[in-house]
Amino acid sequence: MSKNKLSKGQQRRVNANHQRRLKTTAEKADYDDNLFGETSEGIVISRFGMHADVESADGSVHRCNIRRTIRSLVTGDRVVWRPGKDAADGVNVKGIVEAVHERASVLTRPDFYDGVKPIAANIDQIVVVSAILPELSLNIIDRYLVACEAQDIEPLIVLNKIDLLDDDGLRFVNEQMDIYRNIGYRVLMVSSRTQDGLKPLEAALTDRISIFAGQSGVGKSSLLNALLGLNEDQILTNDVSDVSGLGQHTTTAARLYHFPHGGDVIDSPGVREFGLWHLEAEQITHGFVEFHDYLGHCKYRDCKHDNDPGCALREAVENGKIAESRFENYHRILESMEQVQVKTRKNFSSSDD
């Protein structure tokens, strides 16, 4: 994926924030090594400011401080940590995270002040949850798929609430989902209420670290609670409510949970919705995987893939090689990006002067 470009004002803010953090860190004393035991391997299951909950090999969870030399630590990181000892006055000393292993993958989101911000690590797949209610939106599904391709993390499309469909509705929705099956995406149709289709979903989640993405109202929390086997008293409460747009942020901490059937999930409202405004137009184009065979074959090198003469993509649409809905959503995404980028430039205009 090509490097995301920031405006001069955004870059100045990123650098200023980083220098401020370094100055604050330098003024603080580091932790006394004598307060901690031997090093162990662990995984970060949640991050709270300057502390992290680390799960050890035996499954126990330890609240840890974070060495000031560690610049980035997120849920899912594999770490080296040391347990705290009891100090002489009987006050329990927290553990400490000493180092972070190299990440197999990192999930990021655009941030107005810090550029592209990591929010979860070592994710194997993003479960894109949609539903027939409040409405089945292929445009939203396509936006999530573009985000997955940009992050280079495999997506799994899960369509929830199929119990609300009659036979004709089910047939229509299956035809819509065939668009994605035919270009290589995995699609599962489930109902968190009746638990139809949950067994195949459990199999797809086993031995993997997953994260659920989807708009409010599609039943993400209901699915997670069913998969985690939680009762009403244990139900996950950090779902996003009254949020309809991509790219919304939240301060609720991400947390890693273990599925009883195997596999893990990182649950966080902050990573369930993705913004695309930080991506280049070429990245959006590349995010439509069925376009790849036709890119570079247009009559003109600067083809915008719209009404340009000799456009290979439009010809593929006309010949039924590319779904018309996907091609239309591609242009909708580009248009929405332009609108958001204009607003972003206005927000930072005072800083650029």
From Swiss-Prot:
The keyword Transcription does not apply. Binds 1 zinc ion per subunit. GTP binds at residues 160-163, 214-222. It comes from the Bacteria. It is found in: Cytoplasm. Residues 1-25 are annotated as: Disordered. Monomer. Associates with 30S ribosomal subunit, binds 16S rRNA. PANTHER family: SMALL RIBOSOMAL SUBUNIT BIOGENESIS GTPASE RSGA (PTHR32120), SMALL RIBOSOMAL SUBUNIT BIOGENESIS GTPASE RSGA 1, MITOCHONDRIAL-RELATED (PTHR32120:SF11). This is Small ribosomal subunit biogenesis GTPase RsgA. It comes from Klebsiella pneumoniae (strain 342). The gene is rsgA.
